[in-house]
Amino acid sequence: MGKQCYVTGRKASTGNNRSHALNANKRRFNANLQKVRILVDGKPKKVWVSARALKSGKVTRV
C-alpha cells in the first residue's frame, strides 16, 4: 500500500506547475504524513498518519 493516512485516507493529489508563460507541467501535492506508532487492535503498529489527524486528536501515539 502506498503512502496514505491510516485514519483519514488523505494522500497525494495532482495539479500543475505553471510557468510565467502559463505552460502546465504535472506535479504532486503531497499530504503531510508522519510515520507514527499507534495501537491497532491492541497492538502497537507503525503507520502513516496525517499531521491533521495527529493535531486534531483522532490518533494517540504509543
Curated annotation (Swiss-Prot):
<dbReference type="InterPro" id="IPR026569">
    <property type="entry name" value="Ribosomal_bL28"/>
</dbReference>
<dbReference type="GO" id="GO:0003735">
    <property type="term" value="F:structural constituent of ribosome"/>
</dbReference>
<dbReference type="GO" id="GO:1990904">
    <property type="term" value="C:ribonucleoprotein complex"/>
</dbReference>
<dbReference type="InterPro" id="IPR001383">
    <property type="entry name" value="Ribosomal_bL28_bact-type"/>
</dbReference>
<dbReference type="Pfam" id="PF00830">
    <property type="entry name" value="Ribosomal_L28"/>
</dbReference>
<dbReference type="GO" id="GO:0005840">
    <property type="term" value="C:ribosome"/>
</dbReference>
<dbReference type="InterPro" id="IPR050096">
    <property type="entry name" value="Bacterial_rp_bL28"/>
</dbReference>
<protein>
    <recommendedName>
        <fullName>Large ribosomal subunit protein bL28</fullName>
    </recommendedName>
</protein>
<dbReference type="InterPro" id="IPR037147">
    <property type="entry name" value="Ribosomal_bL28_sf"/>
</dbReference>
<comment type="similarity">
    <text>Belongs to the bacterial ribosomal protein bL28 family.</text>
</comment>
<dbReference type="InterPro" id="IPR034704">
    <property type="entry name" value="Ribosomal_bL28/bL31-like_sf"/>
</dbReference>
<keyword id="KW-0687">Ribonucleoprotein</keyword>
<keyword id="KW-0689">Ribosomal protein</keyword>
<dbReference type="GO" id="GO:0006412">
    <property type="term" value="P:translation"/>
</dbReference>
